[in-house]
Amino acid sequence: MPSDDVRSPSGKPGKPDSGVPRAALRRQLLALRGALPQRPAADAGIEAALAALLERLPVHRLGFYWPIQQEFDARGVVSRWLASAPGRQAALPVVSRPGAPLDFHQWEPATPMVAGHYGIPVPDGTPPLLPDVLLIPCVGFSGDKFRLGYGGGFYDRTLAALAASGNTPVAIGIGHEACRIALVPQEHDLPMDWVVSEGGVF
């Protein structure tokens, strides 16, 4: 399990980053993620920890993300999870319009994809699916499971909307241990139920 050390954008124990403006902190963390040493080993650690967690949880409909900007690529884990038991389904997010919660549409490894908003691939013509577990990419994350994203608020709005409809999913943040930071949550921030890094699950 990862320690609760405060980490700076250098990935080393350091002072809390709560005084750094979030936009600047995102830039630092994205640059750090893009230059991580031993990236294959780190990704293998995330993959193993995530696969084990998914087998522990009662997951039937798994929402995840198409990787951008050097995010951990969960497609391999999700593909193997789908194939390992009948009745499992997966879905990718679709932006219907800026400022709205995300929609999710069914995905399988052979699903045809088209470019969606921001050029991110989305499933082409598959039905909507309501996930009971969501894998959520983290630019940064804190020891108390708060997440720093890209600043668009899509996942915060989505989690809030799903909760309001009585369909609260289990939220699993995915990030690299070097991007663990001290983060003062803002009013709209919602903690993850779990966070997975190459250091383990907490």
Regions flagged by a language model, labelled:
Residues D4-P13, A100-F202:
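Conserved phosphate- and dinucleotide-binding cores of soluble alpha/beta proteins
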Residues P2-L130:
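N-terminal active-site beta-alpha-beta segment that forms phosphate/nucleotide-binding
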